[in-house]
Amino acid sequence: MANYYTDNKDLKFHLTHPLMEKIVRLKERNFEENKKFDFAPMDYEDAQDSFDKVLEVVGEICGDIVGPNAEGIDAEGPSVVDGHVIYASGTEININALRKAGLMGMSLPRK
């Protein structure tokens, strides 16, 4: 089982950069959303723990599914049928894996 996150120590290095605390504090609105949403992080350490867990899941999906599908997706490519785009079969598999993991919409606001 490949994991593009845990297998790449450079990613972890960047996430522990001293500026990350300031970035996370800004992104998380100084952790005020924790008062409204029980799943919002309460502090920097909690946020980093959440990021780490999500990235482990994403890294596993990328290592086990997305990466191995890449060459086939490039070879097959998308097509247009009756004015509608049809994804390569590997793209559908990738999207379904991300959906099943609950990762679709991760960048949307909590409310």
Regions found by a protein language model. Give the residues of each.
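Internal helix-loop-helix
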Residues: 59-60, 90-111
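Extended, charge-enriched "interface" segments that sit outside catalytic cores
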Residues: 1-81, 85
